[in-house]
Amino acid sequence: MPNLWQALVLLPAAAVALCAVTAAAQNATETSDPSRVNRTTFKTTDVAGVKIFYREAGDPSKPTVVLLHGFPTSSWQFHDLIPLLVDRFHIVAPDFPGMGHSEAPSPTVLRPTFDDVGAVIDAFIAQRTMGPVILYLHDIGGPIGMRVAMAHPDRIAGLIFQNFTISVDGWNPDRLKVYEGLGGPETPEKLAETEQFATIERDTLLHKKGARLPDALNPDNWAMDAYAFSIEANRAFMSRLFMNIATNIPHYPEWVAYLKERQPRTLVVWGRNDPLIWPAGAEAVKQAVPTAEVHYFDSSHYALDENADAIADAIIKTFSPRPGMRN
């Protein structure tokens, strides 16, 4: 699908306006009852023939934060964070194709690549939000979100980096070698190697390794991901997307250049004990955006597991509306 970005990202202005009007009408209906505004709702929408599940909460007239999850999890990753932000922000959190409750499309509908998944999420954001958005970028949500930011820099009100690197220095070198080895044409051997990463055992390890109190973590955090693993189509899509991770590396210089040129409002919240993505990734963001606030936590790859309150406080401090400004 070589023209997917043209079809989804470069939407005609009239189509974007129509989406905004439709969303405004729906939001007006949904927020007319004050008791509903701060309640998380669960919805599914069609984006280019792919059913995308998402969580939504808060008043759409407030600044919008789009939460982009990691691998191999889903928007469930943010279930503790959303209630802490809902008084100040409008929250939208999609499940990526083939993950969580979203549909796992066949390769004839959507290729399991970061370019194509990024195009779908870009179109989803255009469809379900109005005005500039703040992007929360975790793990594979980072390269997906940066594609959105690069395509539409004027739609970005801010960026939140959480264990997502824009530099090879941010990778554990051993893991980087794995990703680079999986690149190129798909082979049965590569696919077999990749499938070992889309497992509940690996997911549990990422939650626990480096956590302050690993035995006190909520086991629902990885049990929810086990649901997606149990569906063959989801596991196949995730495995092939994992093989595509190395394609993000050539984009690092342009992402750094974007940050240096645009200087967006930026917050970095980082689990310093992450065995995959190291604190050098946070330092690379700070070098590109010197005004970025950086917070390290004695925690794992999934820093929200133990630090949702502190991360919510940092988001509120950095991105709460200023007088006379929506974002």
Segments and roles (model prediction):
Residues 9-19:
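Bacterial N-terminal signal peptides
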Residues 27-40, 49-52, 57-60, 64, ...:
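Flexible "cap/lid" subdomain of the alpha/beta-hydrolase fold that forms the substrate-access gate
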Residues 67-70, 93:
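Structural cue for short, hydrophobic secondary-structure segments
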Residues 70-73, 139:
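Active-site glycine-rich loops that stabilize anionic/oxyanionic intermediates
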Residues 72, 97-100, 166, 300-303:
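Alpha/beta-hydrolase active-site loop signature
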Residues 72-80, 91:
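Serine-hydrolase catalytic-loop signature spanning alpha/beta hydrolases and amidase-signature enzymes
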